[in-house]
From Swiss-Prot:
Pfam family of the protein (one): Asp_decarbox
Catalytic activity from the UniProt record: L-aspartate + H(+) = beta-alanine + CO2
Keywords for this protein: Autocatalytic cleavage, Cytoplasm, Decarboxylase, Lyase, Pantothenate biosynthesis, Pyruvate, Schiff base, Zymogen
EC class of the enzyme, as a word: lyase
Family stated for the protein in its record: Belongs to the PanD family.
Gene Ontology BP annotations: alanine biosynthetic process; pantothenate biosynthetic process
InterPro entries xrefs: Asp_de-COase-like_dom_sf (IPR009010), Asp_decarbox (IPR003190)
Name of the protein this chain belongs to: Aspartate 1-decarboxylase
Residue positions binding substrate: T57, G73, A74, A75
A GO term, aspect molecular function: aspartate 1-decarboxylase activity
Active site: S25 (schiff-base intermediate with substrate), Y58 (proton donor)
Cofactor note: Binds 1 pyruvoyl group covalently per subunit.
Superkingdom assignment: Bacteria
Length: 126
């Protein structure tokens, strides 16, 4: 049996752009993708802290070091520039691997620059 776990997340990233006319996806600064172990075209869940929207999309690379977090296509209607979002990736693990797996949690500042990376999440800690 397999179990789906959070593989990584980028916590409280600031939306820099929402581009309705693009084909679709979320564009993420390549530095953030690397830090969170998220691949191009990987499916992610996006949670908007400002309005409560949750949706899935796929990732495309943004310019390294730019801080870019841009929602494209239909997803652009679900967020606004300046919103704080959480970008979550998931992995499928067998139960033995799941017992020892440690996710990556990437914390960013208001300009989407990495300020900390942790391998666990505890209630009440940011």
């Amino acid at each position: 049996m397999f179990i789906t776990l959070m593989k990584s997340k980028i916590h409280r990233a600031t939306v820099t752009e929402a581009n309705l006319d693009y084909v679709g996806s979320i564009t993420i600064d390549e530095d953030l993708m690397e830090a969170a172990d998220i691949m191009e075209n990987e499916k992610v869940q996006v949670v908007d802290n400002n309005n409560g929207n949750r949706f899935e999309t796929y990732v495309i690379k943004g310019e390294r070091g730019s801080g870019m977090i841009c929602l494209n296509g239909a997803a652009a209607r679900l967020v606004h520039p300046g919103d704080l979002i959480i970008i979550i990736s998931y992995g499928i693990f067998d139960r033995e691997e799941a017992k020892t797996f440690n996710p990556k949690v990437v914390f960013v500042d208001e300009k989407n620059k990495i300020i900390n990376i942790k391998s666990e999440e505890k209630h009440g800690e940011i």
